[in-house]
Design a protein with these regions (language model features):
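Short, solvent-exposed loop/turn and secondary-structure capping segments
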Residues: 12-16, 45-49, 86-90, 118-119, ...
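Solvent-exposed loop/turn segments at secondary-structure junctions
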Residues: 7-10, 38-44, 73, 79-85, ...
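Substrate-gating cap/lid alpha-helix
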Residues: 95, 124-172
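Conserved catalytic region of serine esterases and O-acyltransferases that act on ester linkages
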Residues: 165-170, 177-179, 184-288
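The substrate-binding groove and active-site-proximal loops of carbohydrate-active enzymes
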Residues: 51-52, 83-97, 141-151, 198
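Extracytoplasmic/secreted envelope proteins and their assembly/folding machinery
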Residues: 5, 15, 19, 59, ...
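Serine-esterase "nucleophile elbow" of acetyl-processing enzymes
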Residues: 1-40, 44-47, 52-55, 62-70, ...
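A short helix->loop->beta-strand "cap" motif at the edges of active sites that frequently abuts
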Residues: 108-113, 167
Length: 288
C-alpha cells in the first residue's frame, strides 16, 4: 500500500494509527504500508505568491514512486494545499480536478486500486487573527481566506464524484467537520487543528478511525481521551509507529523530491532490513 499526501501525511501519525488498526483488526489482509507524504505538495500544481518556493507537485515524483513501490493499493489525501488558501474559483477547482484525473489514470495504468481521501477540515477559529475576507488583496498559507473550508467542501465533492470501480472515496472532510461541530457544542474553543491546517493528536486519531472504517474495519467505540493513552501503552503500537516513521524517512528521498532543494538517496536496503526485524517484533508482541 502506497500512501501519498502533503505535510499532514508526512507527519504520519494518522498513518501509524491506521497501520495499527490494520494489523490488529484485519491481520489477514497482510497490509504493508509505505507512506511518503511531502510537505506543501499539491495535485493542482498551484502555488500562492507568498509561498517561499514553488510548491511541489505530486506528478514530479509519482511515476518513480509507482515504479519503485509497485503498490496494489494507493491511498491519496490531497486538497488542503490545492486551493492555495484562496476563495473559491472555477480555475483552481479545475486544476484540482485535472490532478485527480491524472492520478486516477496513472494508478489504474499499473493495475492498482485507488482510495481517495477528502481533505481534513480547515479551522479558521483558532487563527482568526490572521485570516482574511474574500476582499483581501492577497491570500496564502500565512493569511488564508477565512472561509477556506468551504473551498475544501468543493474539493471533497469533486473527489466523491470520482467514485467508481477500483476508486474508493472516503469522505474524511465531512467526518471531521461533523465531529468538530459536535465538540463545539460543549466547548466552543475545541479544535482539531490549532494552526488551522495541521491536525493535533486527536485529529490524527479521528483521521485514522475514519479511514479504517471506510476500508471496512470494525473498530471498538472509544473516545480519544481513552484510546490515546491505551495506544501509547501498547508495545505493538510503539513498534508499528517506529517502523512507519523509519520507512517514511528512508523512502521519501529514495523516490526523490524537490521542495526548495532536490533530495535523492541511492538505496533503502539497510532500512528494509530494520523494517523486517521490527515486523518480526510486532508479530511476537501481537501473539502475546
Amino acid at each position: 500500500v502506497l500512501v501519498l499526501g502533503d505535510s499532514i501525511t508526512q507527519d504520519g501519525r494518522y498513518v501509524s494509527y491506521l497501520e495499527y488498526y490494520l494489523q490488529r483488526f484485519a491481520p489477514n489482509t497482510h497490509s504493508d504500508l509505505i507512506s511518503i507524504g511531502l510537505s506543501s505538495e499539491t495535485l493542482s500544481g498551484l502555488t500562492e505568491p507568498d509561498h517561499p518556493a514553488p510548491r511541489p507537485c505530486l506528478f514530479d515524483r509519482l511515476d518513480r514512486a509507482l515504479e519503485l513501490v509497485k503498490p496494489q493499493v494507493v491511498l491519496a489525501c490531497y486538497g488542503m494545499n490545492d486551493g492555495i488558501y484562496h476563495p473559491s474559483s472555477p480555475e483552481r477547482l479545475a486544476a484540482f480536478t485535472h490532478g485527480l484525473s491524472r492520478l486516477i489514470e496513472k494508478v489504474h495504468a499499473i493495475g492498482a486500486q485507488l482510495v481517495l481521501i477528502t481533505p481534513p477540515v480547515f479551522d479558521a477559529r483558532p487563527i482568526s487573527a490572521r485570516t482574511v475576507s474574500d476582499t483581501a488583496p492577497e491570500f496564502g498559507y500565512k493569511h488564508p481566506y477565512n472561509n477556506y473550508d468551504d473551498v475544501l467542501v468543493e474539493f471533497a465533492a469533486a473527489e466523491i464524484a470520482q467514485q467508481a470501480p477500483k476508486i474508493r472515496v472516503i469522505d474524511l472532510h465531512q467526518a471531521m467537520r461533523a465531529a468538530l461541530t459536535a465538540a463545539r457544542v460543549l466547548d466552543p474553543a475545541f479544535t482539531f487543528s490549532p494552526d488551522g491546517v495541521h491536525p493535533n493528536e486527536a485529529g490524527h486519531l479521528l483521521m485514522a478511525r475514519t479511514l479504517a472504517t471506510g476500508l471496512g474495519l470494525a473498530l471498538p467505540e472509544m473516545t480519544a481521551a481513552v484510546e490515546l493513552p491505551a495506544l501509547a501503552a501498547d508495545p505493538r503500537f510503539t513498534l508499528i509507529r517506529d517502523r512507519r516513521a523509519l520507512r517514511s524517512e528512508a523512502w521519501l528521498p529514495y523516490i526523490g523530491y524537490t521542495n526548495g532543494k532536490t533530495y535523492h538517496s541511492a538505496s533503502v536496503a539497510a532500512t528494509e532490513r530494520v523494517v523486517a526485524r521490527l515486523q518480526a517484533e510486532i508479530a511476537i508482541a501481537s501473539a502475546k
